């Protein structure tokens, strides 16, 4: 579409600023001024009269008379605004809010030809979706699907989107589907969830901006467009393009669904038949367009009145357009209106009405909400609801933990804040609902109380009236001396008494005290119901109900017996009627007394309830004490169980030691039986000196003989079997013990409860018995008082009977007078009713007339208001048109002067031509004979000149006629000037302002030409910068992708490492526990062996006496054997003492080596942070290893010193023991070799146990070191993970920053594209102007001289070459920009 048809944007480098509005959901207004068309640029001075100017980005001034009008909007775009700035100011925020679940609407409003379709769609070319001047709708598609793709990249498979498009038009108040060309008229329907929708409209699913473009172009081809005098392609219908966006997000089996609608509306423009010159079908279309737009204006006016607090009916259903856009205008949507205005003076009235419409629409406030629904697994949702209920109950009971936010991780803080706010909101809602219900109930009760008070007052008035009438009648009868009454009078009197009794009953029923008591009774009953739910109260109520039933039965029997005594034969006499009325009054009194007694009982019940609550409190306190006692008892039992377990463990250890001892004794017997021992006799003793070496060898063989493996396996199996049996017995006993203890605890609790219940029941029973005795005595006293009262009532009844008999006689006379007065009263009442009916009829008629007058007055006021607006508009238009006529008059004067100057010039030229002709003719006559050839040429030239002269003569004639016509028009204009001279004085200042503005515009044109050059240079710089930014962006993308991959790999490796570390940690803990158990066992075994060694020492002391006798005989043999045994013992002791050192210096394999290798691989992938982390981790691990090694060495040295000391002490003891044993061997005792062998074995066993203990300690130290290493590794991994998370956050912020910079650069590029388009258009227009001016100049000048013509042609050629060079530059720049744009789209 060319700029001249629907509006033309111009260049601006930056988008308009988005100002924050006071109300977030108020309708925002964007005003755009349409640029002038091409035809207006070829005026007299290159300018056209503009009726408005944009003062700033938010204010606009309309040049009206006598004073200009100022309008303020959210955004005001001048003539130079680009399509990109319009999109960034209007549609960008709306599209983002639609992504967040809000409904959004954008529609363009304005007169026909003001640029609505150009703003919404763009130019009418076929490639307008990729055109640089494309409108709001295509750009909205691009941005929407860009945001969708971005969200998908962020969320992955957890979030999905569905976009559906529909396209309809409203033509002549009928709805048609543009996506289905064969569809008939569609209908609007309303749904409780969807709102207003079109039945049967086609919805196409789209997945990209290109598909949305196809849907839009397919529907746009079906739209009704026609040509008018103001617009070559005028929209003849309202078009509504709707995009439905649905997003589904899954988190832990819960699905959050958000849905929103984006309505993009292109309204048809308002038209005037005088301006557009429409007729026939076009006129009908214009009428329906104007009607729907007027309905839109009425709806907006009504919404503004409602916002200001007035009660107005909003007529949405008067037009299909307003009904369809109901939510957008005053409901659940965020709305932006683009008001397009025409700056031309001819469109002043429509421009003014458009600005007033936009100003009213700006005052409307919508209430946009997020359209969100939650679905998912029922169990998950139920668990969430249960969790929320538990938290709510805890918060209500005051048991909610205060540090719940501290215990959570920092990432859960937002959820906890949300949960706390949600709980507070729920509590506030419940509290407000309960308060509201209580207040409503109180209001109802108070209204009932007021009604009852009114009825009570009315009944009192009636009673007073009856009594006054009765007194008057009695006084009259007393004065007249009437004693007897007729039957009619008696009947009337009885009827009046009955009426009085009825009013008394009503008074009793509607008495305010009774109502108050009823309210108190109601509240007490509710309290009683709550109390009655308790078991103790239920029991008490049952007992009281039984007692009450018995008392009521006794009272009824007593009352029946009284009635039987007092019943007399009934006769239908006036006295009996009187008796019945008196009885009814007595019954009412009894009822009153009964109500008062019920009130007293209810109060008494309330006191009893207080006592019961106190008892319940005492009961609970006693229960609490019993529970505390039971808790103390359980703690004592637990301590006893622990002590018992310790005792059992010690017993098991003893049993284990005994079993080991028993199992090891057969090995000794086996060793003793398996070897031949030389028999000792007297000969052997005598020959001992010679046989000692052989016996020593035998002893060595016996000692060095190994134990057979079968015996050790049997010993181990026996120990394991015994341990298993003991463990099974222990577990069974423990289970039984637990069961018995739990049973015992339950029984003790039951016993305590039963004791407490029995004591409380006994106390309650005693108190209730005393209460019932008191109540029984009170009832007996009440019965006695009632009997006395009954007797008094009988006496009073007798007196009243006599009085009634006397009064009846008086009443018979009074009834006659009453009947006469009633007749008079009935006549008076009939007259009064007739008058009242007449007055009411008159009142209704007057009221109807008043209503009609009010309606007429309102309609007249509305008509007056509309006429006033129309009058103001017409007045403004008339003033503006007069200004335009004055301007045209001045222009015509100027043109007239120019024409006169041209005419004088032409006359001078004509005279010069005549002189030239005369000169030429004279020269021809002189040179006639000599220059025949030249004569012929001159003749030709003369003929040519004659033709030119004839042409000039014709031109002069035409100019003379035109001059006459202009003189005639001048005379008519002079007459008009005479009429307008008075007004001209007032408008001179405005003309001066306009001239100044023209001068300013001329200067701005010069500055703009200079700025165009600067902008072209800046464009080149920006292009170069943009290419650099694109390269940097690509590098950033690659770096981000690599970092994301590295982060994912690091996460996976960390998870693997954490799982492996956890498994190893568990294994190490198990090993450590096993090692500690083995160490305990070894210490126990060592203690047992020490006890055995002490026992052996005692035996040795007993046998020292025998050994001392044989010392003298075996001195030589003992010396030799001592030396041998010392050498043999020193060797194993040295080997034993050196073995821990060797073991301690064995190489250690750390657990963290595979993790360090993996971490090294991760460090190679990471760039900067990983190097630092690896260095720190290496230093830390080295230091930890050094510390652990030093600790191990210290422990080993200490252990070695201790073991050496122990071994030295043991060696000394063993040496002494061996010396003693060898001395005792001389006696020939058979037990000595076996004892020595046992001692050696015990020593070897003790040494091996010490070695195992050392190994176990070394193993424990190794495990501790490995644990420290794993802990350090975990700390390092946590630190690196935190750093990676920080790096992730930083990359995200950089990505967001890059996104915003990219959007800014894209908007700048779009503005540059539009600038190039505008520059090319202006270049074409300038070329046309140059050609036109060249033709006009050639015509005016006529090129008298060939040299002038040649110079002029050379000048034109140079200018043409310059223009061609500029055009070539601009074409190259345009191609470069298109290529960069294609590259950007490819990216």
Curated annotation (Swiss-Prot):
GO terms for biological process: centrosome separation; microtubule-based movement; mitotic spindle assembly. Keywords: ATP-binding, Coiled coil, Cytoplasm, Cytoskeleton, Microtubule, Motor protein, Nucleotide-binding. SMART domains: KISc. Residues 26-364 form the Kinesin motor domain. Residues 369-1383 form a coiled coil. Disulfide bonds: none annotated. This is Kinesin-like protein KIF15-B.
């Amino acid at each position: 579409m060319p700029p001249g048809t629907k509006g033309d944007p111009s260049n601006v480098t930056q988008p308009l600023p988005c100002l924050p509005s006071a109300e977030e959901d108020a309708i925002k207004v964007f005003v755009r001024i349409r640029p002038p068309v091409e035809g207006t640029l070829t005026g007299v001075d290159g300018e056209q009269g503009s009726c408005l100017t944009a003062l700033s980005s938010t204010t606009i001034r309309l040049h009206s008379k006598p004073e200009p009008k100022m309008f303020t909007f959210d955004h005001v775009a001048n003539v130079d605004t680009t399509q990109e700035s319009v999109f960034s100011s209007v549609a960008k925020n709306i599209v983002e809010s639609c992504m967040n679940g809000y409904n959004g609407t954008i529609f363009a409003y304005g007169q026909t030809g003001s640029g609505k379709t150009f703003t919404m769609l763009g130019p009418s070319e076929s490639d307008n979706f990729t055109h640089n001047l494309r409108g709001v709708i295509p750009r909205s598609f691009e941005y929407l699907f860009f945001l969708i793709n971005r969200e998908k990249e962020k969320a992955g498979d957890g979030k999905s989107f569905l976009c559906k498009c529909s396209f309809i038009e409203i033509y002549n108040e009928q709805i048609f589907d543009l996506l289905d060309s064969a569809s008939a008229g569609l209908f609007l329907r309303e749904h409780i969830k969807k709102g207003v929708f079109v039945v049967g409209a086609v919805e196409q699913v789209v997945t990209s901006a290109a598909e949305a473009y196809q849907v839009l172009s397919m529907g746009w081809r079906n739209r009704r467009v026609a040509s008018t005098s103001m617009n070559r392609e005028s929209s003849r219908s309202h078009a509504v393009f709707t995009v439905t966006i649905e997003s589904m997000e899954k988190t832990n089996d819960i699905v959050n669904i958000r849905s929103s609608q984006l309505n993009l509306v292109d309204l048809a423009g308002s038209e005037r038949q005088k301006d557009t010159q429409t007729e026939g079908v076009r006129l009908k279309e214009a009428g329906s367009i104007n009607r729907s737009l007027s309905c839109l204006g009425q709806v907006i006016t009504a919404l503004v009145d409602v916002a200001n607090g007035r009660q107005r009916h909003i007529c949405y259903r008067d037009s299909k357009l307003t009904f369809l856009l109901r939510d957008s205008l005053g409901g659940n949507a965020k709305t932006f209106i683009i008001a397009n205005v025409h700056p031309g003076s001819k469109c002043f009235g429509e421009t003014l009405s458009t600005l007033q419409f936009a100003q009213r629409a700006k005052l409307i406030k919508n209430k946009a909400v997020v359209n969100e629904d939650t679905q998912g697994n029922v169990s998950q949702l139920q668990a969430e609801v249960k969790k929320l209920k538990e938290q709510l109950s805890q918060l209500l009971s005051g048991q909610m933990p205060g540090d719940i936010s501290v215990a959570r991780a920092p990432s859960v803080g937002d959820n906890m804040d949300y949960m706390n706010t949600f709980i507070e909101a729920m509590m506030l809602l419940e509290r407000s609902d309960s308060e509201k219900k209580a207040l409503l109930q109180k209001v109802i009760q108070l209204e009932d109380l007021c009604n009852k008070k009114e009825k009570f007052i009315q009944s009192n008035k009636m009673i007073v009236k009856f009594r006054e009438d009765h007194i008057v009648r009695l006084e009259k009868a007393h004065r007249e001396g009437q004693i007897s009454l007729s039957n009619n009078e008696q009947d009337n009197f009885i009827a009046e008494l009955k009426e009085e009794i009825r009013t008394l009953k009503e008074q009793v029923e509607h008495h305010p005290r009774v109502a108050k008591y009823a309210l108190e009774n109601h509240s007490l009953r509710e309290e009683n119901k709550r109390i009655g739910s308790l078991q103790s109260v239920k029991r008490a109520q049952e007992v009281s109900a039984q007692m009450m039933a018995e008392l009521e039965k006794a009272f009824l029997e007593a009352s029946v017996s009284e009635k039987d005594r007092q019943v007399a034969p009934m006769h239908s006499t006036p006295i009996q009627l009187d008796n019945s009325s008196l009885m009814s009054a007595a019954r009412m009194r009894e009822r009153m007394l009964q109500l008062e007694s019920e009130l007293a009982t209810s109060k008494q019940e309330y006191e009893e309830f207080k006592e019961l609550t106190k008892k319940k409190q005492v009961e609970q306190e006693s229960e609490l004490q019993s529970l505390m006692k039971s808790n103390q008892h359980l703690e004592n039992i637990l301590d006893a169980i622990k002590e018992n377990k310790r005792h059992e463990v010690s017993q098991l250890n003893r049993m284990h030691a005994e079993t080991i001892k028993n199992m090891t004794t057969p090995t000794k017997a086996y060793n003793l039986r398996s070897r031949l021992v030389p028999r000792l006799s007297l000969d052997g003793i005598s020959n001992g000196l010679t046989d000692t070496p052989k016996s020593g060898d035998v002893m060595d063989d016996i000692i060095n003989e190994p134990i057979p493996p079968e015996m050790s396996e049997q010993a181990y199996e026996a120990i394991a079997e015994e341990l298993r049996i003991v463990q099974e017995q222990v577990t069974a006993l423990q289970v039984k013990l637990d069961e018995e203890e739990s049973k015992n605890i339950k029984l003790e609790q039951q016993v305590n409860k039963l004791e407490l219940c029995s004591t409380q029941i006994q106390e309650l029973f005693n108190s209730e018995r005393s209460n019932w005795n008191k109540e029984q005595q009170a009832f007996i006293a009440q019965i006695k008082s009632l009997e006395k009262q009954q007797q008094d009532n009988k006496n009073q009844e007798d007196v009243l009977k006599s009085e009634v008999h006397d009064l009846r006689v008086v009443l018979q006379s009074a009834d006659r007078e009453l009947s006469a007065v009633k007749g008079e009263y009935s006549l008076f009442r009939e007259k009064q009713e007739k008058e009242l009916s007449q007055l009411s009829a008159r009142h209704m008629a007057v009221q109807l007339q008043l209503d009609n007058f009010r309606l007429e007055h309102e309609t007249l006021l509305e008509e007056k208001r509309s006429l006033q607006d129309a009058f103001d508009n017409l007045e403004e238009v008339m003033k503006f048109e007069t200004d335009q006529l004055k301007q045209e008059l001045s222009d015509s004067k100027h043109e007239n002067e120019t024409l006169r100057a041209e005419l004088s010039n032409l006359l001078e030229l004509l005279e010069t031509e005549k002189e030239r002709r005369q000169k030429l003719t004279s020269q021809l006559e002189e040179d006639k004979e000599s220059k025949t050839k030249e004569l012929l040429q001159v003749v030709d030239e003369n003929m040519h000149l004659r033709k030119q002269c004839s042409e000039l003569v014709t031109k002069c004639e035409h100019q003379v006629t035109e001059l006459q016509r202009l003189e005639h028009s001048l005379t008519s204009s002079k007459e008009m000037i005479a009429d307008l001279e008075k007004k001209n004085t007032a408008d001179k200042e405005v003309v001066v302002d306009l001239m100044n503005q023209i001068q300013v515009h001329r200067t701005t044109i010069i500055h703009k030409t200079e700025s165009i050059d600067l902008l072209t240079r800046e464009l080149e710089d920006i292009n170069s910068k943009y290419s650099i930014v694109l390269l940097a962006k690509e590098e950033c993308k690659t770096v981000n992708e690599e970092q994301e991959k590295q982060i994912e790999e690091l996460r996976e490796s960390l998870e693997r490492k954490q799982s492996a570390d956890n498994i190893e940690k568990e294994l190490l803990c198990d090993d450590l526990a096993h090692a500690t158990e083995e160490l305990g066992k070894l210490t126990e075994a060592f203690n047992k062996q020490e006890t055995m060694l002490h026992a052996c020492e005692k035996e040795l002391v007993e046998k020292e006496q025998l050994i001392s006798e044989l010392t003298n005989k075996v001195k030589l043999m003992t010396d030799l054997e001592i030396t041998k045994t010392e050498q043999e013992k020193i060797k194993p002791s040295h080997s034993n003492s050196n073995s821990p050192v060797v073991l301690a210096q064995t190489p250690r394999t750390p657990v963290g080596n595979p993790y360090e290798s993996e971490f090294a691989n991760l460090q190679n992938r990471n760039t900067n942070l990983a190097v630092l982390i690896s260095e720190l981790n290496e230093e830390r691990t080295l230091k930890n290893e050094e510390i652990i090694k030093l600790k191990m060495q210290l422990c080993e040295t200490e252990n070695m010193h201790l073991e050496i000391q122990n071994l030295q002490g043991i060696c000394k003891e063993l040496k002494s023991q061996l010396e003693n044993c060898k001395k005792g061997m001389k006696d020939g005792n058979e037990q000595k070799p076996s004892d020595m062998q046992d001692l050696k074995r015990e020593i070897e066993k003790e040494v091996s146990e010490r070695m195992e203990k050392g190994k176990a300690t070394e193993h424990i130290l190794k495990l501790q070191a490995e644990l420290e290493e794993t802990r350090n590794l975990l700390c390092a991994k946590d630190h690196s993970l935190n750093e990676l998370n920080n790096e992730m956050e930083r990359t995200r912020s950089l990505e967001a920053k890059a996104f915003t910079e990219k959007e800014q650069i894209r908007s700048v590029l779009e503005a540059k594209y539009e600038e190039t388009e505008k520059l090319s258009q202006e270049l074409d227009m300038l070329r046309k102007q140059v050609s036109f001016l060249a033709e006009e100049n050639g015509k005016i000048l006529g090129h008298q001289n060939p040299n002038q013509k040649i110079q002029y042609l050379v000048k034109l050629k140079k200018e043409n070459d310059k223009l061609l060079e500029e055009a070539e530059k601009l074409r190259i720049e345009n191609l470069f920009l298109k290529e960069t744009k294609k590259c950007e789209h490819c990216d």
